[in-house]
Amino acid sequence: MADPASYRPAPGSIPETPGVYRFRDEHGRVLYVGKAKNLRARLANYFAELHTLHPRTQHMVSSASSVDWTVVSTEVEALQLEYTWIKQFDPRFNVRYRDDKSYPSLAVTLHEEFPRLQVMRGPKRKGVRYFGPYAHAWAIRETLDLLLRVFPARTCSGGVFKRAAQVGRPCLLGYIDRCSAPCVGRVDAATHREIVEDFCDFMSGQTGRYLRRLEREMQQAAQAQEYERAARLRDDIGALRRAVEKQAVVLPDGTDADVIAFAEDELEAAVAVFYVRGGRVRGQRGWVVDKLDEVTTADLVEQFLTQEYLDGTGAASTGTAGSTVPTTTAGSQGEGIPREILVPALPPDVEAVTELLGAARGSRVEVRVPRRGDKRTLLETVERNAKQAFALHRTKRASDLTARSRALAELQEALELPDAPLRIECFDVSNTQGTNVVASMVVFEDGLPRKSEYRRFAIRGIAGREGAGREGAGDDVASMYETIHRRFSRYLAERSRIADIADIAELGDIAGAPGAAQPIDPGTGRPRRFAYPPNLVVVDGGAPQVAAAARALDELGIDAGPGGVALCGLAKRLEEVWLPDTADPVILPRTSEALYLLQRVRDEAHRFAIAYHRQKRSTAMVASALDEVPGLGDTRRKALLRHFGSVAKIRAASAEQIAQVSGIGPRTAAAIVTALARSAPGRADAPAPVVDPRTGEILDTETVS
């Protein structure tokens, strides 16, 4: 028996979306299939303390050795996919229906003179049209209850129909307008069959024309002041919209297609494939592959199609430098080439690819990108699964102790460091056309993010400072210089402070071992800010940013090299690693764990900087000259704006007029007049007006919305 904790997914790796999940044993056999509105919440229940679980659930989770899942858009999709997988895998821990029959379908007995709508199980019969299957019979009855208001077809058995005809009275459904009562001659056979055919068309997905027709009739009834009829039509429209929730996992009209989607970054790509046969998802496969070089999504599609369908070896070699990592295997049914293949982008030479596929299949094959409708929705579902598989792969890789150790060892070797860089700090600068310039510092220790050590910097501007490079706060190079200078100035200040408050003999050689200088604040017990020196500094950028960071360290007397604080930069376009005072970058292998770690660190710094920049930009959009008035809080600012209407009108008012506003005294009114006069447009020392970067609007004349 396995311990469920041994295969529990990493925290945060399970999405909070609808989906279907599978527990497997050590041999890959599916033990249990379930569905959930919220996968994270549902799966968390299985990994609770064993003694709190139902005995059958205890046995299942102890017998399993892995769990995987597929995300879908709605609960309806989850029901359909759950049914498909239960039928396909026959999991021994799934509950059987009491009648031990197949799942129910909504059947229409078209072979009868007066067709009947009913719940039907078992093998299909000739002359009967089926919709479904459904997971539960009550789901069919709920659907019928909604649709019979619009399509009042017969639902009674043959005996009930015959008795009603004999006595000349319909059943209850006939009296409440849920049946057109053909048993007593209210409609003839042709009219009743027309109702049934309309019902079948609607259930097949042709919903638009019925809804449009009913909406026209509702508007006409309202114009004719037939309000009761208009209200009924309104309710009918609502019933139709509730009854049929579009299903992205199921395609109408028995479509056979393979649906392919990708999620990728610079080094890897995840591919997910749904195999649709007879309009239903019959299988799913997924891989994560390494990219050998710079390839587009269209290139990935071409490689996948040729190798998966023509080589007969599967997708294991698709754009890879080695073996692939299977992410999900759900009983693929992709051995044959379908008539239609849906992809996110057409291959560069689509004609040649389709010709090869057609020759292998023996008939025409269409490769296309769906733009709208059910097929587009299904492709988006597959894309979500590819992204989820890719995110899960990255999470597993990042949390793999062996991979992290290898990454740090590779970094040590590539950058010629004396020790593995156990503490890495990465810096990134973010701005919008030189405004609201900010920088971020993220910290990775032992290859994992340490978010409590993250720091943010509002760039103040360093124009004219020696060694700053080009001038201006909006200059990324100058901003990087300022950020590095401020961070390590704080470090030196903290080190000096520790030396001042402690006995030098007890601290040891601070200059030689700065990390050993007791960087814990005795008052709070927490680490001092900026007290720890990094083993490696990474800047987001190429040679110019690295040179600026090196100048900042040099000015502070810190060696930017293997003997001091190691420094490098990661350029985005080609993922090159730049070192100080080198003409050429270091090129790490694209499959290198070291490069993967540097990317994660750089991407995290970029995310953190962007978040802070957006916060600053949002604040600037609602700033005004009133913010400069000392002692004027948000409540009184709003009161002033409500009273006068805008900052410009407040500026034109006298101190006496301003003092009439509730909560504003004479002293505060005088301070407001002085501050607004100082910031008046046209003065040489007036600050530039705040401008909304999205619209170009000058926000100095802020008004109350």
UniProtKB/Swiss-Prot annotation:
Q: Which CDD domains does the entry mention?
A: GIY-YIG_UvrC_Cho (cd10434)
Per UniProt, the keywords (alphabetical) are: Cytoplasm, DNA damage, DNA excision, DNA repair, Excision nuclease, SOS response
Enumerate the spans annotated as GIY-YIG domain. Answer: 16-95
- What ranges does the record list as Low complexity composition bias? 315-332
Q: Where is this region: Disordered?
A: 315-335, 683-705
Q: Which GO terms describe its molecular function?
A: DNA binding; excinuclease ABC activity
**Classification via SMART domains:** GIYc, HhH1
Q: Which SUPFAM superfamilies match?
A: C-terminal UvrC-binding domain of UvrB (SSF46600), GIY-YIG endonuclease (SSF82771), RuvA domain 2-like (SSF47781)
The keyword Disulfide bond is assigned to this record = no
Q: Which residues form a coiled coil?
A: none
GO biological process per UniProt: nucleotide-excision repair; SOS response
> The UVR domain covers which part of the protein?
208-243
According to its UniProt record, where is this protein located? Cytoplasm
Q: Gene Ontology terms, cellular component aspect?
A: cytoplasm; excinuclease repair complex
Q: Which NCBIfam families match?
A: PRK00558.1-5, uvrC
**Subunit note:** Interacts with UvrB in an incision complex.
What does the sequence similarity comment in the record state about its family? Belongs to the UvrC family.
Q: Tell me, what does this protein do in biology?
A: The UvrABC repair system catalyzes the recognition and processing of DNA lesions. UvrC both incises the 5' and 3' sides of the lesion. The N-terminal half is responsible for the 3' incision and the C-terminal half is responsible for the 5' incision.
Identify this protein by name. UvrABC system protein C
Name its species. Answer: Frankia casuarinae (strain DSM 45818 / CECT 9043 / HFP020203 / CcI3)
